[in-house]
């Protein structure tokens, strides 16, 4: 019976990836940013997207595997893994909290309701303008044009400003120390 069937159509479903994402990931990696993907999608889908944007091939860790770990073992797995799949909003939040607890400066980019707990947990929550309103409401930064390509530029500017503040503070403290020394 199957031999008598004739195919009528072929349907292919794939995620559209933003055109600037591969170059943005390359710039972030060049700046020393450790990129992690935390997704609720199927592991093969997440790995495929990571490969298409130029992230190094890495094993995928599922929530079911993470749930079996606790304490230092959980923290070590989170630190060593770059791609997480089949994660719930609560696990996304737990992963972000673990990284922050380990002393990492954690920035989270999300656009959906399921990202809200993790966005709130991150030190810098970033939402896409075309994402869910609640994600934008809880984020520290909203990318108005919904493009990640502005992040490497923001990182460069932030580091430049921080360096200038450091130099100014050092100069100010030196001047004050010399004034106190002159008075004494």
Where are these regions (language model features)?
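Cytosolic ligand/metal-binding cores
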Residues: 119
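A short acidic Gly-Thr/Ser loop motif
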Residues: 40, 112-113
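Conserved actuator
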Residues: 39-52, 128
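Conserved beta-strand/loop elements of the cytosolic catalytic core of P-type E1-E2 ATPases, chiefly
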Residues: 3-24, 29-44, 59-68, 81-90, ...
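Membrane-embedded transport module
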Residues: 53, 57-108, 112, 122, ...
């Amino acid at each position: 019976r199957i031999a008598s069937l004739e195919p009528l159509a072929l349907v292919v479903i794939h995620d559209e990836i933003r055109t600037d994402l591969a170059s943005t990931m390359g710039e972030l990696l060049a700046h020393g940013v450790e990129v992690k993907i935390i997704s609720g999608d199927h592991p093969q889908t997440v790995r495929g997207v990571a490969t298409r944007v130029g992230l190094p091939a890495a094993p995928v860790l599922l929530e079911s595997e993470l749930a079996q770990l606790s304490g230092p073992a959980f923290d070590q797995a989170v630190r060593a893994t770059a791609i997480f799949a089949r994660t719930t909003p609560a696990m996304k939040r737990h992963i972000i909290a673990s990284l922050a607890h380990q002393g990492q400066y954690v920035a989270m980019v999300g656009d959906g309701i399921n990202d809200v707990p993790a966005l709130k947990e991150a030190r810098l929550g970033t939402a896409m303008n075309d994402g869910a309103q609640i994600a934008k409401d809880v984020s520290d930064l909203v990318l108005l044009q919904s493009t990640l390509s502005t992040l490497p530029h923001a990182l460069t500017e932030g580091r430049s400003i921080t360096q200038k503040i450091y130099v100014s503070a050092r100069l100010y403290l030196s001047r004050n120390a010399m004034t106190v020394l002159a008075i004494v």
